[in-house]
Amino acid sequence: MTAPKPVVLCILDGWGLRAEREANAVALADTPTFDRLMATCPNATLVTHGPDVGLPRGQMGNSEVGHTNIGAGRVVAMDLGAIDLAIEEGSFPQNPALRDFIAKVKANGGTAHLMGVVSDGGVHGHIQHLISAVEVLAGEGIPVVIHAITDGRDVAPTSAGEFVGQLVRVLPEVARVGTVIGRYWAMDRDKRWDRVKRASDAMLHATGEHAPDAEAAVAAALARGETDEFIAPTVVGDYAGARDGDGFFCLNFRADRAREILAGLGQPGFDSYDTGTRPDWSAFLGMVDYSKEHDRFMTAAYPKPVIRNTLGEWVASHGLRQFRIAETEKYPHVTFFLNGGREAPETGEDRYMANSPKVATYDLQPEMSAPDVSDHLVEAIGAGYDLIVVNYANPDMVGHTGDLKAAMAAVEEVDRGLGRAVEAVTTAGGAMIVTADHGNCETMVDPETGGPHTAHTTNPVPVILVNGPAGARLHAGRLADLAPTLLQLMQLPQPEEMTGRSLIDA
């Protein structure tokens, strides 16, 4: 029996399953294709959180974690757990890169600038990592300025006051908050440089809104109608900007939303916007490595481990062709993260990125660029590729807005694209796995507060086999089982590094 061609992995980003219909965009939306597949095709569920994806118990998954595990075909220990462990066991203060940072800042008589997410969301950063770093640096007698990035997306939309209060209560005498900035400005990943400039101008030059203290900055933003994600860059007290000899330490452990702001703050030759005169930093440190380009001007406390024989690498090594497609918001996930943290395409790997719409928030255009993704996906299905990986961003990105009606519209647009993909795969004689990397839009109201729910969930996600082998059934599993499943459909052996198990029971 010949292998189906192409084999398609269709990732419905943020499409989780929840029995209750209330505030459940997936259940309330009109999804004839998804409903038909669930009724007629082999299906099961996958776990996308906690130890099953290399995270601490109870920690929700996210797109970086999800796509890394999917591409690796094994559970990959993620940075959050590794950093938590280093802090818990006491090795963090002795981290060699951190010791080097301390030595350089001390030698120059500088101040340490720490930028980090002030929440316990654990997707891009964690308040406890920030507090621990402050303690270490202050313990060395180094003055510390914190650039507090408020969240409101991976935690409740108006929880920043609580987190900022938690932070300032434990600050040693030599540490202070210099700026308070919503992640909308400081953590863009779509080249919206006007936003990034406002964030970096506040950190570098102390320009923006002003408040007497950090808690007042949050309160003033709320009074202006800004929830935590959107807090306008605010300078706190008499903070006057960064100076020559200072050091900069980024506490974010996820790359995609740290790259732009770090480039603006420290990349030599940066010209995407006018940064003004930047300081001559004595040291520039990241919690992790963010890209090859960033490695040229900064060091990493916890470099990423090398993941060998990912799905893409293994398929390429067998001389087969593959195609990756997503819109801008999720393009790094189906390329960089799926390939184990490598930017360059594999041999025989083609890519297409649809430009995400330039709107302030995606509830304003819930279809996003899904029609363009669908057009190019259908074209690719008929183009002779062996493996295609596609990500539909809408359920996650619109889910993050907390707008139920918009999330339903997003789900319906993706279902239309899914219908086109199923038809094209069937015509081509291919097979498809439909799944998600984590949940989100199936829970649009916070059950505890009754307000909008904007974060990911720990709900199971679907996995559906379309046009699989006759009599095949699926069993429940985790994201690391997807690559072995795809390889089985492609009739390729599984590399020994992949410890996941195929979900197909023939």
UniProtKB/Swiss-Prot annotation:
Its EC number is 5.4.2.12. The active site is at 63 (phosphoserine intermediate). Mn(2+) 2 binds at residues 13, 63, 437-438. It is an enzyme of class 5 (isomerase). It comes from Cereibacter sphaeroides (strain KD131 / KCTC 12085). The keyword Oxidoreductase does not apply. Pathway: Carbohydrate degradation; glycolysis; pyruvate from D-glyceraldehyde 3-phosphate: step 3/5. It catalyses: (2R)-2-phosphoglycerate = (2R)-3-phosphoglycerate. Mn(2+) 1 binds at residues 396, 400, 456. Binds 2 manganese ions per subunit. Catalyzes the interconversion of 2-phosphoglycerate and 3-phosphoglycerate. Substrate binds at residues 124, 153-154, 183, 189, 254-257, 330. SUPFAM superfamilies: 2,3-Bisphosphoglycerate-independent phosphoglycerate mutase, substrate-binding domain, Alkaline phosphatase-like. CDD domains: iPGM (cd16010). This is 2,3-bisphosphoglycerate-independent phosphoglycerate mutase. InterPro entries: Alkaline_phosphatase_core_sf, BPG-indep_PGM_N, Metalloenzyme, PGAM_B_sf, Pgm_bpd_ind. The keyword Isomerase applies.
